[in-house]
Design a protein with these regions (language model features):
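DNA/chromatin major-groove-contacting recognition/catalytic segments
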Residues: 16-19, 75-77, 201-222
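Short, leucine-enriched amphipathic alpha-helices that occur as contiguous helical runs
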Residues: 28-32, 127, 167-171
Length: 222
């Protein structure tokens, strides 16, 4: 049986994260947080389900910026600016590739919640819990998935939450990075894909979303 993979939109994620967890078990909240780490890192579950303090470091980034020269109107002076960036370093278990993922504010907030040592749950448990959360979030949009049986393909309408699993996090992260306008060569440095071609096969943005991305980025279509 073959099933088309899905990804969660920004709107889906907002609903997913805003579910009232008091109506579910503590395990559901942990599963949701682990899943969201997978989204923000765009890693496989074997990597995002094991992140701890040893994987996290803070880097000091120095850059040169031009600022107005207070003593010479219309001129600028170069100034060195420093900023700290929290980074997750992972050696991917499947490929052995080393990747470094800058922490977004959302990701850092989750890591801080667990004192930078994420709890671990079995994959099957995460899969069960995140489906519960997806249902509670109202992710009941009908998705036509393709099932193959005996060499015959058939489209089967299925509620979206039933298709959420641990790998959805990685696909969601990669797709949202792409739709945000991030360069594919930068994305593969994070995801560990071997080439942009492999990444593009992985991204699940539909035609309308791709058109929206292109027309926002390029004035050619104005």
């Amino acid at each position: 049986m073959d099933i088309d993979s899905i990804y969660l939109t920004k709107e889906d994620l907002e609903k997913f994260q805003n579910v009232d967890m008091t109506k579910l078990s503590p395990g559901h909240e942990i599963a949701r947080d682990i899943f969201m780490v997978g989204v923000w890192t765009a890693q496989r579950v074997s990597d995002y389900n094991n992140i701890g303090r040893d994987d996290i470091q803070t880097l000091t980034i120095r850059s040169i910026v031009d600022e107005p020269d207070p003593e010479n109107v219309g001129k600028t002076i170069a100034k060195i600016v420093t900023r700290e960036v929290t980074v997750i370093n992972i050696r991917q278990k499947k490929t052995g590739a080393k990747v470094a993922i800058p922490c977004s504010s959302d990701l850092k907030r989750i890591l801080e919640k667990y004192n930078f040592q994420m709890p671990h749950l079995e994959d099957q448990v995460i899969n069960r819990y995140i489906k519960d959360i997806g249902k509670a979030a109202g992710l009941t949009e009908i998705v036509n998935i393709v099932k193959t049986n005996g060499g015959e393909e058939k489209e089967v309408p299925t509620e979206k939450y039933k298709l959420i699993h641990t790998h959805t996090a990685r696909r969601t992260g990669a797709t949202l990075m792409y739709l945000s306008g991030m360069d594919v060569y930068d994305i593969i440095k994070i995801t560990g894909h071997t080439s942009p071609v492999m990444l593009r096969k992985y991204i699940k943005a539909d035609e309308l979303e791709v058109v929206e991305k292109i027309t926002e980025k390029y004035k050619y279509f104005d």
